[in-house]
């Protein structure tokens, strides 16, 4: 089987890094097309031996990208096309059908109740999504929570498959030596209690809540923010105004999978933390929380379907927090008062092993490879 994965961009992000990890475990010959931004993850995929094509799309309405994408699919002789993220799902499904491929699947990585990929959901976005969804044979939801959102949108339940995001458990196994070295490298005091936040620095992630929570905690508490994004300068200013700028560290974008770049990777940074806090109120999965649990960290979160969809005993060190900075400050103080626990991965982390996710996806591939009636692009346009 030859498969083509089409994704909107390949900068450092959850969906992008998940694609790279997945391709390491899929027993399928895969190429990747990125519509825009062939960033750090594109370099990582190339280092893994994956062929990456940059389509050079200039914007959402660059219709010249469609015939170029059709040509790439035809020339590649692909049996299956798998799309990721909104723009790639719109253009990728249509291009695959025009190129004669019928085995089409899309993964819905980031559908929230009120936003998708950090943007507000409107009637136009939903209508276009549903029209293009009909061109494929299946839509993969990364959690039962997202599957429920898709059903409420109007995607027929038989077309939805749940394939959770996966993690490389061995990659996140706690290493006390790496913890010590990373904390030294970051210049952290030996007695620092380190609160971690991981993710794109965007307004929707609400990392400002953690900055304000830090201001309510004793002076030996530090905040380590792992990720890059447009809100970094805003967060720096917020930290300065709150009087905690000297206790907030920004690492910038860090790879989840080793890519040879200098500086500590995500696992080492998780080892350096004492607790992970995730104040984002609307998540589709909560990959950062699961990775933190795999590193043996206690977690305080506002939203995490990956944990909420499992029995409570699966992640005893994970607690949901309702409220803003005051609530997080109390929850983090309670986490510290509980004292350190063995840094072992709970059942929830094992549930999300990447091998299991890859096996589930292969089952989806096998199902959609079986011919079944589905509408043509012309039929969808007419409807």
Describe the predicted segments one by one.
Residues 312-326, 334-339:
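Conserved acidic donor-binding segment of nucleotide-sugar-dependent glycosyltransferases
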Residues 5-64, 149, 229-230:
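N-terminal strand-loop element at the rim of the active site
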Residues 73, 253-254, 259-264, 268-273:
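Short alpha-helical donor nucleotide-sugar binding micro-motif in glycosyltransferases
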Residues 63-67, 102-105, 112-135, 148:
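Nucleotide-sugar donor phosphate/pyrophosphate-binding loop at the beta->alpha transition
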Residues 281:
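Aromatic "clamp/platform" in nucleotide-sugar-dependent glycosyltransferases that forms part
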Residues 34, 298-302:
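Short hydrophobic beta-strand element within catalytic cores of glycosyltransferases
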């Amino acid at each position: 089987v030859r498969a083509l994965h089409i994704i909107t961009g390949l900068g450092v992000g959850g969906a992008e890094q998940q694609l790279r990890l997945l391709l390491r475990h899929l027993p399928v010959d895969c190429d990747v097309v990125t519509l825009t931004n062939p960033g750090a993850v594109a370099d990582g995929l190339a280092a893994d031996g994956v062929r990456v094509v940059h389509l050079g799309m200039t914007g959402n309405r660059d219709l010249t990208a469609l015939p170029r994408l059709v040509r790439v699919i035809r020339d590649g002789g692909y049996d299956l096309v798998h799309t990721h993220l909104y723009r790639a799902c719109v253009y990728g499904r249509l291009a695959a059908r025009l190129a004669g491929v019928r085995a089409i699947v899309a993964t819905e990585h980031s559908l929230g109740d009120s936003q998708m990929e950090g943007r507000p959901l409107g009637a136009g976005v939903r209508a276009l999504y549903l029209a293009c969804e009909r061109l494929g044979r299946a839509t993969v939801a990364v959690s039962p929570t997202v599957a429920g959102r898709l059903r409420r949108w109007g995607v027929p339940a038989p077309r939805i498959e749940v394939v959770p995001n996966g993690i490389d458990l061995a990659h996140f196994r706690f290493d006390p030596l790496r913890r010590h070295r990373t904390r030294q490298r970051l210049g952290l005091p030996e007695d620092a209690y380190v609160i971690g936040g991981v993710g794109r620095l965007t307004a929707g992630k609400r990392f400002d809540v953690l900055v304000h929570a830090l201001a309510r905690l004793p002076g030996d508490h530090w905040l380590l923010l792992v990720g890059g994004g447009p809100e970094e300068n805003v967060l720096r200013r917020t930290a300065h105004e709150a009087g905690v700028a000297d206790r907030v560290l920004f690492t910038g974008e860090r790879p989840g999978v080793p890519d040879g770049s200098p500086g500590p990777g995500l696992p080492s940074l998780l080892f350096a933390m004492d607790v992970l806090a995730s104040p984002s109120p609307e998540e589709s999965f909560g990959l950062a929380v699961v990775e933190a649990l795999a590193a043996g960290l206690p977690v305080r979160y506002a939203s995490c379907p990956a944990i909420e969809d499992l029995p409570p005993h699966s992640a005893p060190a994970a607690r949901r927090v309702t409220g803003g900075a005051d609530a997080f400050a109390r929850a983090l103080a309670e986490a510290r008062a509980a004292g350190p626990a063995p840094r072992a991965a709970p059942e929830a982390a094992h549930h999300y092993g990447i091998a299991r996710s890859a096996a589930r996806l292969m089952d989806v591939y096998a199902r959609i490879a079986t011919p079944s009636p589905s509408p043509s692009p012309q039929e969808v346009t007419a409807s």
